[in-house]
């Protein structure tokens, strides 16, 4: 049994008003949605609730409006895109509380789907204001949270509502939580983590948490340079946070105490400038020229990472191994991603990945669909990896 209530526990909802918190923070250009992935992810929950005769009312934020309602942050164009994905009409109410919202709900029939306007048009939303939560709850009988990506925020539409109405995890939220449980909560060992990206400073909490939970930690990207420098390696003109060398040393000490192997690059792809087609060479990590920048890990390191992926039963991945946006500095990330995907498809690996750059890198490698689970949740995924409580999830627990 899941530790949280899901749609399997919801009972008879025919004719009930179900408020569903969803993630509709999708890219929009010229009034049109350019990537509907997040809408596609919530479609099963909406279809299931609607099919059971519920009146489905969608709650979401969009962007970061500063001073109340603003046309550029309206969800109205997204209602149209949601209707296209669902293949059915989706109503739109130009407020999320008050008379306009109430009258739109009153006009609903069983199975109808309605999208409320941006919850962040009210400052009270982000303050988790109890009075605002009650105004939202007035339009619902049941609350379903299907927005894991907003679960790290204690807002009225994520945490406040769940305190006022019977609350359940939607199918997207459920899938995310079950995947994360396999990744770090209760994983099959050995567990290997790959952490890349530019800076150690943004991932200190993440690294400190992981060394206590995984058997091996592969460090790549610009952040590997900070660890190499902490070990006394000259990294030339590579991106490096020299002031964080003591932090990197402390992470390595804690890893040793916890029995977690730290895997750092033994060679690197070096160039004098960061641009497409720049002249580059692979050198041992001890031979980085003074005017060179490490922009990817080298072939020997790729081989080592592959060997660790072969040993792993579970892989957790956040961040690219090199500057994957520009060829040929995408080689290591693509090679490791394809290797992990092949192991996953063969049934030998549980692979969980997340974070914006990571998703982009796996898409670039063409293997995002072959991983066990790829989280699009951004900040919530990172906070989960950091071992921090997620208010929007905790409130759904049985």
UniProtKB/Swiss-Prot annotation:
Q: What is its main location?
A: cytoplasm
Catalytic class of the enzyme: transferase
Q: What is this enzyme's EC?
A: 2.7.2.3
Q: Which residues bind substrate?
A: 23-25, 38, 61-64, 120, 153
Example GO biological process term?
glycolytic process
* Places the protein is found: Cytoplasm
List the signal peptide residues: none
- Reaction(s) the record says it catalyses: (2R)-3-phosphoglycerate + ATP = (2R)-3-phospho-glyceroyl phosphate + ADP
Q: Which UniProt keywords apply?
A: ATP-binding, Cytoplasm, Glycolysis, Kinase, Nucleotide-binding, Transferase
Q: Under which pathway is this protein filed? A: Carbohydrate degradation; glycolysis; pyruvate from D-glyceraldehyde 3-phosphate: step 2/5
Q: Which GO cellular component terms are attached? A: cytosol
Q: Would you say which domain of life the source belongs to?
A: Bacteria
Q: Which residues bind ATP?
A: 203, 325, 355-358
Q: Which family does it belong to?
A: Belongs to the phosphoglycerate kinase family.
Stated name of the protein: Phosphoglycerate kinase
Q: Which organism was this protein described from? A: Mesorhizobium japonicum (strain LMG 29417 / CECT 9101 / MAFF 303099) (Mesorhizobium loti (strain MAFF 303099))
